[in-house]
């Protein structure tokens, strides 16, 4: 199967055009000397100026200069560059033939080249900044704004926004700033990474993130997919790759095996929490499976290790794990706490037990802070400095997501009166208009803090974005001070922190992260030629793959026909919902293409095989084998399109179109789906289907398929 982002394809096209241009320029080497740039790189300090010089200027031409980032460097019509703020920009220089001077065969305009500009230093301003003593401390119990949610305009196209200034180092934190450990890299201010929005344009919901050394690890909900709970790794908080899975396989139960009409769509591994315990030297992952129970997994090696499993048949909704002293605690359903311990299984490789220690209780009342939530979940718990922090998502209705923080200097032995509440983020991004919430915070080896929250993006799923965290925020406009609260927001064009506390407020700039940009381009999706020459029983496929529910290992293979993933019908299924051994990957916005080639000679009457787009429902392109054994390309979808749960055993594949060509022998059939995610603009996410019999000439087939997000069916 081949998967490629439209952005990657476009990048290759640009590279080819550059090569062509250089080749044609080479044919003019013997010609008269032309105007050219004297230098391709310049450096200028903030507030200073420097000119771009051109050799061999002529009176017949004028010259234009354009900056790629006017917030970093501006340029005049005479080529004089002014440094605005620290960062990098590119000045494009063009030569224009003056009016009336054009001769036959001569181009009126040509690009001389590009000058890379590095702006260094920050210009200091004599602006009085309020100190904590001159402003009022924020009242933690203030009632939040009840401004009506803002929906994106149907035809709105987000304006292009340049990255903001580098994040200032926070001057105050509830925990001491870390000392850079031996071997840790120094921060390179000229190689910082930039996070745009969304942070990851893919379905990565309910994320939780930790730092161990200079590495960041993140887990996410993958519901019914196996292996479950992907562990993603990054060194710069922007580029992520899947390195492991906590749950290699669900327990052998009907709902996980698609047996007897049971399934675990919209359930499965839900809202995982990830922690590292310095005392035990173990990584811990916990999650809840609705209608089944609570699971905990541990490993000493998060990237390459195997995981021990523990289970209890009880429910801890959206759990957060926190260690305090020698105690292990689960915060769940927003404000409840339960102390637990782990008991090893006596059987080798068996599942251990999660043991409740004492009874559970509520830490505080949900009305603390004057909040009246219709949604209250997604807990994340931390001990930072003198405080225990509990972060949750809250909503008054209309599904606008908000992030709320609760804190106390006591945890398990705390009283309700020990807790305070503060709304720390209420807003969205310039890219999309629904609220951002539910996630965690993480520090860097240099002492900066960032928040990771997610946002509903219709058919694309629930996508994460990164926000700046300020522990010492002074709101000069409203004369408020928020000491030791993790207020979230962004940095404006002047480098000032802006906190969002209203449904109409938006993050307006990408965020420059105080981390060295990774030189490794990592992705959570990828290609596969299904070549596994050393594959043996028990081995895994590439980390980008997940099965839909537990696989039936007796009926799939990558070794029987090397270079192909072989699926056998171990049982009859009337639809994709109950077809075992289906392989899946996430899609990536804004545009995405998935392709595969199938060999279908062994299909039997009534069989279907192919490529599907699954969201709230499914559409597919594939091969059908009719009652006479003839095979044709078809495009279809699920027949039950009601708004309720659609993943039913009784549902049948609805055929929307069938090709005229009959497939003979073992002739390859090439299938393709093109995705266009337009959330935030038209909110119309679409998929179109294509097939080819030679791999080169593609034909469109069937209907355009509308993608959507539905909590009643897949929750993806």
Task: Specify the residue positions occupied by each region the protein language model found.
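C-terminal segment of classical bacterial N-terminal signal peptides
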Residues: 19-28
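Extracytoplasmic soluble-region selector
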Residues: 27-132, 136-138
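Bacterial N-terminal signal peptides that target proteins for export
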Residues: 1-12
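Generic detection of short hydrophobic beta-strand segments and adjacent strand-loop junctions
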Residues: 17, 40-44, 50-52, 110, ...
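Feature for long, exposed domains in two main contexts
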Residues: 11, 21, 95-97, 111, ...
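Ser/Thr/Gly/Pro-rich low-complexity, disordered linker/stalk segments of secreted
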Residues: 123-179
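Carbohydrate-active catalytic/glycan-binding domains of CAZyme proteins
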Residues: 144, 154, 166-170, 174-716
């Amino acid at each position: 199967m081949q998967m490629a982002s439209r952005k990657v394809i476009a990048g290759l096209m640009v590279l080819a055009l550059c090569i062509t241009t250089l080749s044609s320029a080479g044919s003019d080497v013997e010609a008269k000397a032309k105007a050219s740039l004297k230098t391709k790189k310049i450096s200028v300090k903030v507030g200073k100026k420097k000119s771009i010089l051109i050799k061999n200027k002529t009176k017949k031409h004028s010259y234009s200069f354009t900056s790629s980032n006017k917030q970093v460097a501006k340029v005049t019509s005479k080529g004089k560059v002014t440094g605005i703020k620290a960062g990098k920009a590119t000045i494009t220089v063009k030569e224009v033939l003056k009016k009336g001077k054009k001769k036959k065969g001569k181009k009126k305009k040509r690009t001389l080249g590009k000058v890379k500009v590095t702006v260094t230093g920050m210009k200091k301003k004599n602006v009085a900044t309020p100190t904590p003593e001159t402003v009022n401390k924020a009242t933690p119990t203030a009632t939040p704004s009840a401004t009506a949610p803002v929906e994106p305009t149907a035809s709105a196209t987000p304006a292009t926004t340049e990255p903001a200034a580098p994040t200032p180092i926070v001057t105050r934190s509830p925990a001491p700033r870390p000392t850079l450990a031996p071997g840790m890299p120094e921060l390179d201010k000229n190689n910082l990474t930039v996070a745009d929005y969304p942070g990851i344009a893919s379905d990565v919901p309910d994320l939780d993130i930790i730092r161990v050394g200079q590495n960041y690890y993140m887990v996410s909900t993958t519901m019914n997919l196996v292996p479950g709970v992907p562990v993603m790794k990054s060194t710069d908080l922007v580029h992520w790759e899947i390195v492991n899975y906590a749950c290699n396989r669900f327990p052998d139960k009907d709902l996980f095996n698609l047996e007897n009409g049971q399934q675990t769509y919209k359930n499965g591994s839900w809202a995982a929490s990830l922690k590292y315990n310095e005392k035990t030297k173990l990584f811990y992952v916990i999650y809840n499976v609705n209608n089944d129970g609570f699971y905990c997994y541990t490993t000493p090696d998060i990237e390459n290790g195997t995981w021990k499993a523990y289970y209890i048949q009880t429910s801890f909704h959206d759990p957060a794990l926190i260690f305090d002293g020698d105690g292990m605690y689960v915060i769940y359903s927003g404000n409840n706490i339960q102390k637990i311990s782990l008991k090893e299984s006596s059987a080798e490789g068996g599942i251990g037990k999660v043991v409740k220690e004492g009874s559970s209780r509520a830490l505080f009342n949900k009305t603390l802070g004057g909040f009246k939530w219709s949604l209250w979940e997604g807990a994340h718990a931390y001990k930072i400095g003198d405080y225990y922090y509990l972060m949750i998502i809250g909503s008054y209705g209309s599904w606008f997501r908000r992030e709320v923080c609760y804190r106390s200097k006591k945890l398990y032995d705390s009283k309700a009166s020990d807790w305070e509440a503060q709304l720390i983020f209420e807003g969205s991004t310039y890219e999309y208009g629904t609220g951002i919430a539910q996630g965690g915070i993480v520090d860097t080896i240099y002492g900066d803090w960032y928040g990771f929250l997610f946002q509903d993006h219709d058919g694309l799923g629930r996508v994460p974005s990164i926000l700046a965290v300020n522990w010492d925020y002074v709101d000069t406009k409203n004369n408020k001070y928020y000491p030791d609260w993790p207020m979230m927001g962004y940095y404006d064009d002047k480098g000032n922190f802006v906190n969002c506390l209203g449904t109409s407020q938006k993050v307006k700039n990408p965020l420059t992260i105080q981390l060295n940009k990774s030189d490794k381009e990592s992705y959570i999706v990828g290609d596969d030629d299904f070549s596994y020459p050393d594959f043996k029983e028990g081995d895994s496929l590439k980390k980008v793959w997940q099965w839909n529910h537990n696989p039936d290992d007796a009926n799939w293979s990558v070794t029987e026909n090397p270079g192909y993933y072989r699926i056998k019908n171990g049982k009859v299924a009337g639809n994709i919902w109950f077809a075992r051994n289906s392989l899946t990957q996430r899609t990536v916005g804004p545009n995405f293409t998935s392709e595969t080639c199938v060999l279908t000679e062994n299909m039997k009457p009534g069989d279907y095989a192919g490529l599907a787009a699954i969201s709230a429902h499914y559409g597919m392109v594939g091969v059908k084998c009719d009652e006479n054994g003839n095979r044709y390309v078809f495009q279809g979808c699920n027949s039950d399109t009601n708004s309720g749960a659609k993943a039913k055993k009784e549902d049948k594949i609805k055929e929307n179109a069938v090709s005229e060509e009959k497939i003979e022998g073992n002739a390859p059939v090439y299938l393709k789906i093109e995705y266009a995610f337009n959330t935030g603009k038209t909110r119309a996410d679409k998929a179109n289907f294509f097939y080819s019999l030679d791999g080169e000439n593609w034909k469109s087939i069937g209907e355009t398929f509308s993608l959507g997000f539905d909590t009643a069916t897949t929750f993806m």
